[in-house]
Amino acid sequence: MANGRINRPAGRNSNTSKQEVVVRTDRPIVVDATNHIAGRLASNVAKLLMQGNRVSVVNCEKIMMSGTRSNQIKEQREFLEINSIINYKHGPVHYRRPDTLMAKMIRQMLPFDRKPSGKEAHQRLRTYIGSPKEIKSLEKIQFEKALIRKTASNYTALGELCRIIGWTE
């Protein structure tokens, strides 16, 4: 202890770690979600949104959910059974489309209910099934740490899962 300060070694909580900083632009950052793990993609997109960027996520039906197919289906079906005894409108909203499911995952990683900055960040988000014409010409990015590492047979595509729980294209 020198001069009233505690000297701590640089560790996990220090600010010396390398973090990717993306500069705010007028054009949206387009993320191609093909073969990305859902949670890792959502956390990376949430960070970009909180930095003040506009983000568009394309190909939401090709996002991968980790875990066995049967477990993913079972968890989604159990979630669909949650509702209110008195009135079904009082229960949670059950999204079945891949783009709205992904938008909800990202929203849950933002301070949506606690801070106005979270709501503003969520308004800068756009999610799409496929790739719309106006976005096809823009450069698309991918997050290396969010890509799947094993073969695709170890994951379930979000589009496939949504078709099973009731999404009709």
Predicted regions: what is each one?
Residues A2-E169:
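Ribosome-associated RNA-binding proteins
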